Curated annotation (Swiss-Prot):
Enzyme class: isomerase
Cited PANTHER family: 39 KDA FK506-BINDING NUCLEAR PROTEIN (PTHR43811:SF19), FKBP-TYPE PEPTIDYL-PROLYL CIS-TRANS ISOMERASE FKPA (PTHR43811)
Record gene name: FPR3
Record-given protein name: FK506-binding protein 3
UniProt-recorded Gene Ontology molecular function terms: peptidyl-prolyl cis-trans isomerase activity
PROSITE patterns per the UniProt record, alphabetical: FKBP_PPIASE (PS50059)
Amino acid sequence: MSDLLPLAAYNLNIEPYTPTPAIDVTTPVTVRITMAAIDPEALDDEKNPSTLRIIKRNPDYDDEDDAGGLLGDYDEDELDISEEEEEEEEKSKSKKGKGKGKSKKQEEEEEEEEEDEDEGDEELIEIDTDDEFQEFVLATLSPKTQYQQSLDIVIAPEEEVQFIVTGSYRVSLTGNYVKHPFDAPGYDDEDDDEEDDESYDEDEDDYLTPDEEADLEELEDASDVEAKIQELVEKEQSKSKKNNKRKQPEPEEEEEEEEEEEEEQKLVEETKKNKKAKKEKKVEFKKDLEEGPTKKEEKKEEKKEKPKTKVLEGGIIIEDRVTGKGKACKKGSKVGMRYIGKLKNGKVFDKNTSGKPFVFNLGRGEVIKGWDIGVAGMAVGGERRIVIPAPYAYGKQALPGIPANSELTFDVKLVSLK
């Protein structure tokens, strides 16, 4: 079964005493059934166990062969005539029998025997027609003893297969629609025809026109052939030289082309510079958080003061990189933050640099203790680095990307305050 490639899930509900086709006509795909399960809800008061049966057409049964064997080479008109002749013969025989002096009882007994023979023939015909289908039991399921039964049945679309359930419970079949190796399209005769056409076309290319054949006859001599080839080569060379001379541009045209190329190059460089400037604006905040304020100009660098460093409760260190404007946040303030969290070795384990800011109520225990202490006092637009010892971070607790007893460094920026 390893060659069967699952395509989709297969499910089929079978109601009691309702023959159900295994494959729908609208989806002619091979199925593999792997499980039969009983619905524990009974559909009648008897609550009899449900038996699942598979009904399939007998491959040895053939309607056409049987009909052909019976009819032979006769047509319908000949059969009708022969039936009429047989009826007349039977009537004449019955008259002769009566003329021979048979009693009424004997005649009645003979008629009963004939009727019995006819009934027997009908039963035989019914039995023969029953052989058209084969029935097999797959499983008997009951809520009291067995809810489900594993199966492994593969059914192709060309097979005429139905399922039927006898009992008080419906049965559900599950499995997969699968791609069977035999489902692959066979070798098409049209491919042969196409290949023959291609080979025929190729052969046609090898044939020569009458003019070409005449030229070959004229050049029977090997020396003539060589001379002709030499002439053709010289003609081709002279043509190529003329073309090269024509293609050489004038000096003025070259200068104009160079000027146009320079202008295009300038435009490309200007657009690149504009794009770079936009990108620098976008990532300016991110770079400030990760690497500190960028050094844009030497004059500004001289004027800037060094970040103010403070040590707070529990050894928490804060460095104010940029001082915000407005009122400072305090306990109970609702603050919106951008941040980048790093381990002591510089590895980033978490960040919020775009999208919706991280919002929390300061001093209410909604974040780690180091944040409640380290963020207090910041104003909107302020940027700060907070170094938090392990006891004021996650302590001995290990989280994804954060080992136990880790010292954490956060570069934060206050973007909103309520």
